[in-house]
Amino acid sequence: MKRWGLQAMAWLAAMVVSGHAVAAEERFDGVVTRITDGDTVWVRPDVTEGHGRRKPVKLRLVGLDAPERCQPHGSAAGAALAERVQDRRVTVRRRATDMHGRALGTLWLGEQDVGAWLVAEGHAWSARYGDNPGPYAGQERRARAAGRGLFSVPDPELPRDFRRRHGPCD
């Protein structure tokens, strides 16, 4: 637990140094209006939450990395996420905003962390930070052992390696 806390602090410090805006966690409820890919959704906040906005917020799920859309299993990851949350009421726990203006945080469907679900079902990897296997390492280990989703093939290529070899999807 102590190790994870130190590594989380290092991750937040890296975000500050890299130009990411970090603020206190903001929570809001809303409806998922669009799925960009296996780890990015658009959520329209509820007016009743006092935000005074109904413009959808682009949310990049933290703690995981889903395959690129043009990568093997990329379409399946996006489809699984859409089936799970599209047009559903969710809670966003926004931690920061990245340099592209995307909110960074977690998505909750009731009491379920959607990121944990994606990794457990084999639709994404637990995001690694240096030596830290990430917050969903246990879910990834079990998905690998069961051969779920992208782990049904030996040694699936990490998205960062795929991007390095092929560039971004068009």
What spans do the regions from the language model cover?
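Positively charged n-region of N-terminal signal peptides that target proteins for export
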Residues: 1-3
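Bacterial N-terminal signal peptides
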Residues: 7-19
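Electropositive
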Residues: 22-129
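N-terminal targeting pre-sequences for secretion and organelle import
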Residues: 130-170
